[in-house]
Structure formats: structure tokens, C-alpha cells
Amino acid sequence: MNFFLDSALLGLEYALLAVGVYITFRILNLPDLTVDGSFTFGMAVSTVLCAAAHPFAGLLAGALAGAAAGVVTGFLQTHCKIHPILAGILTMSGLYTVNITVLGGPNVSLLDAPKFFEVLGGKAPAVGLVTAVIVVLVTLFFQTVGGLCIRAAGSNEDMVRASSINTTAVRWAALALANALVALSGAILAQCQGFGDVGAGSGMIVIGLASVIIGEVICGRRGIVIGIISAVLGSVVYRIIIALALRYNLMSANSLKLLSALIVAATLAVPAAAAAARAGRERKENRVC
């Protein structure tokens, strides 16, 4: 039982990463590769402030740092006219230097530093509470005018622009929110694992996508509320799957990122293959008719 609880707890620590990826990938319908950098940025800021005995300030500042990274990516996309994928790569690359500067080295230990969960009754209740509160707030936000504008921009940006809505501000807000959640996940993880590492963000975009896709397989794609909840659930299930694979020697620890990439690639390829098969059948039926 402890095995599953520990895996579920780790999944909750990464849950906000999955929600952030869900916002850009599904709601904004935009690929954002800033995630690897903003995750570590939030972790670095949280680590430094936690080491200075300010754990809660570390969480807040980590989230704000991620939001700033998202705004930079938005600026590159909207004002510099850089392709979204390249804009994310540029921000992510620049953040590596920022992160190692903030940490002051490749990693920092938090062994004797106070952690946010010590005040809230332990890791599980603290992480669960923070995740639940953030998920509720994000869900409520997407029912507001601002949230609806982001959802509309993801569906049809030209229509939103024709409605005299500032699409630049909408994109900035969406990227800031998504990367704030990703960075908050990194901030939480730093305090829960007891150290911050400059290489911790490697592959986070793939892990986030895998969590989102696993959640959609379980819950389906049925609206914004179910989508956000499914991202959290997908993160937990993903960690349980990985833990089971490692426990029963089905794969080595070095193969984790390969497994994540295969999950994402297969899940994204199946709908396209199914659509191609349907189109082929329809063409055959039309020729017969």
C-alpha cells in the first residue's frame, strides 16, 4: 500500500506540471517548449528561498518566476514574430543560465531547511491541499471572461481578434498561467525531495504530455473541468505505471524518458492513423458507388 501511496504522492507533486501542459497543448492549442526551463526556474527560486527559511515565499516566488518565463515566450511569439516552438526553445535555453545563476551551482541541498509541508501536517496532506486549491482556482478562472477568451483564442484566434479582443494579451496570459503552474510544480518538488538541481527540468514537456494523454484515455475529452482533473489523474497514474515497471524490473531507470516518449508518440499517432483508415474506407465506398 505504501508503494502506491508514495507513487501517487509523487504524481501529485508533478500534477500542476500536467495542468500547465494541458493549458497550452489542449486549451491554447499551442506547442510550448518553455516547460523544461520554467520547471527548473521555479525549483531554483523555491530552493534558494527555502534555504533562507522562507518556504511559502519560495512557492509563490517560484510560480511568479515561471509566469515571467511564459511572458518572455509570449513576447518572442507576438512581438518578435518567432515561431512558437522556436520561441519556447530560446526561452528554455536562456533559462539554463538563469537557473544555474540563481542556484549558485548545479544543485543545492535543503536537508536542514524548513519546508512548507512541515507546517501543514506532512507531505501528503500539504501537497494534496495545495494541488486541490490550485486546481479549483484554475477551473474557476476558465469560467470567467478572461478564461473564456483564452479558450476562444485556442479554438479560433482570428474570430477572437475580429471581436476586438487583444489576442496578444490573451496569449501572454495563457502562457504566463501555464508556466506559473509548471514552475509551482518544480517549487513543490524541490522542497519535497530536499534539493534543487539545475538538470531537473530535462524531459518535463514529454512527462507532462504523457500525463495529459493518459488522463484523456481514462476520462475522455469532455470539457475544461474534466480535462484539468484528468491531467491530475494522468500524472498520478503515470507515476504508478513507472514505479510498477521499475519495481518488477520491466525496464531500467535509464529508459524512463524513452517510455514517456513512446507513450506520447503512440497516443498521438493512433488518432491520425484511424482518421487515415476511415478516409481510405470512404474513398473505396465512393468508388464502388
Each predicted region: which residue ranges?
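Transmembrane alpha-helical segments in multi-pass inner-membrane proteins
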Residues: 182, 186, 192-258
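Short loop segments and helix-boundary regions at transmembrane helix junctions
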Residues: 26-31, 69-110, 121-123, 194-198, ...
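Alpha-helical transmembrane segments within multi-pass membrane transporters and channels
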Residues: 21, 54-93, 132-135, 234, ...
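Single transmembrane alpha-helix segments in multi-pass membrane proteins
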Residues: 3-54, 76-80, 213-221
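Helix-loop-helix "hairpin" substructures at the membrane interface of multi-pass membrane proteins
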Residues: 123-205, 209
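Cytosolic-side transmembrane-helix boundaries in multi-pass membrane proteins
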Residues: 155-162, 166-169, 241-289
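Transmembrane helix-bundle core of multi-pass membrane transporters
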Residues: 84, 88-143, 172-173, 196-198, ...
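Hydrophobic core segments of alpha-helical transmembrane domains in multi-pass membrane transport
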Residues: 18, 43, 47, 96-97, ...
